[in-house]
A protein has these predicted regions:
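N-terminal helical cap/lid subdomain that shapes the substrate entry/recognition surface
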Residues: 2-94, 115
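Asp-based, Mg2+/Mn2+-dependent phosphohydrolase catalytic module
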Residues: 1-6, 98, 103-224
Length: 224
């Protein structure tokens, strides 16, 4: 496959979102400890990673400890405002470097996308970045993809979108005529498309396989 532009999702596509969750939970626990004088770090880790309470985590914690639900918003803010460095997947930087000859875009529905890019140290790799929550929209809106393609001056037929979540990542770019590639990795590994037009054109299990699909060649060896 030869393309003139490659666009990426961010969470679980270029890095492991669980690392973002871990650092965010630490920051939220630090803030709660500053308010209460008690440590809830272990409880938050248990709820999120062991009991898999990934929605309403802070509500559940506050309920368990009979603390005011009014603290939820502040804890969510601390979670997303964490500043600890994040690490891309080991092969991410090498893959992006190998794609330097074509424009690169990034489209993410994840809150705090700009903060994540800075913490990952890969912002400068991208020629166009759209973080949909800042625009009060999502990747379900074709305008999001059209905006990036216009900024990169390429047509949909010349572009590819790489993502991981078949619920949201592929339907719109498929409809626009973009090629789509799923990285089956991360939180949504076991989720299958619920409709035909949400299925990707290609599927890979390791990001450096993208170079093979795009006929770019193998990346330079990376340190693990």
């Amino acid at each position: 496959m030869r393309v003139s532009c490659v666009c990426f999702d961010l969470d679980d596509t270029l890095y492991d979102y669980r690392e973002y969750a871990r650092t965010g939970l630490e920051a939220a626990a630090d803030r709660l400890e500053a308010y209460t004088g008690e440590s809830y770090h272990d409880d938050l880790h248990r709820l999120y990673f062991e009991e898999r309470v990934t929605d309403g985590t802070f509500d559940r914690l506050l309920e368990e400890h009979d603390l005011s639900q009014s603290l939820v918003e502040d804890l969510v803010e601390a979670y997303h405002d964490a500043t600890a460095p994040l690490s891309p997947y080991p092969e991410t930087t090498a893959v992006l470097n190998r794609l330097h000859s074509v424009p690169l875009g990034l489209i993410t529905d994840g809150r705090g996308g700009h903060n994540k890019l800075d913490r990952l140290g890969i912002r400068d790799q991208f020629d166009s970045v759209v973080v949909t929550p800042t625009l009060d929209t999502t990747k379900c809106d074709p305008v999001v993809f059209r905006t990036v393609l216009a900024e990169l001056d390429v047509s949909p037929e010349e572009a590819v979108y790489v993502g991981d979540d078949p619920r949201f990542d592929f339907r719109v770019p498929n409809q626009l005529g973009m090629a789509t590639i799923r990285l089956r990795r991360g939180r949504y590994t076991d989720i299958e498309p619920d409709r035909e037009d949400a299925a990707p054109d290609h599927e890979i299990r390791h990001l450096d396989r993208l170079l093979t699909v795009l006929s770019v060649g193998e990346p330079e060896p990376t340190e693990n």
